[in-house]
């Protein structure tokens, strides 16, 4: 399975650079809409140029430029593959994951599963996917409309596809992630994912850093305050690792 990705490297390269995999959210329409991964290369290049980070933004399976069809398990596996790729680059030292919305939950799950990940930042992240699990065929229809799944046929192994919706849970994964650091950022006015989910994730982790963005909605990629919190946290993470 071949996936497209944007890889940003610091000017002049170097070795043992901090690195992060950033996971986009579930698209709100064809091409991604407000959750489009096309909005992330600019952020990645900024982080590489201003902070000296290696940044990878994978276009998860089913997204434009990438092969395959959407499944929750598949997207998690794509993030694990991205981590594996980053770790193998000569420029890369320590690795973190970050994500927005669905991507935030899967960044937690992938980070928990790979002990080489130093910490995770989760923004506008659902604690679980029970709403999807309760109505998988509605999700499948949404995925088709967004261009993530072949229009003509259901995903191969629909039962397995459906099962992953209840099996994959950021709330469970943060237990495995601890005591590695967790940042949880959420908009106080998020109407897609209840702010209670953010409190649940940070509380279940036990030492998660929770930052609520006053008046912000769900699409935190487009909120400068949320991005400032993310970049500040990553910078502190890297500095604490050095000292």
Predicted regions and their residues:
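Conserved alpha/beta-hydrolase
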Residues: 42-65
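Hydrolase active-site cap/lid region
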Residues: 110-160
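Conserved alpha/beta-hydrolase "acid-adjacent" motif
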Residues: 191-197, 221-222
